[in-house]
Swiss-Prot record:
Key words, A-Z: Amidation, Ion channel impairing toxin, Secreted, Toxin
Compartment list: Secreted
Protein name as catalogued: Occidentalin-1202
GO cellular component: extracellular region
Domain of life: Eukaryota
Residues bearing PTM Methionine amide: M9
Tissues/organs with expression: Expressed by the venom gland.
């Protein structure tokens, strides 16, 4: 779920 972390940024 790396895309999730990038989504918040």
């Amino acid at each position: 779920e790396q895309y999730m972390v990038a989504f918040w940024m």
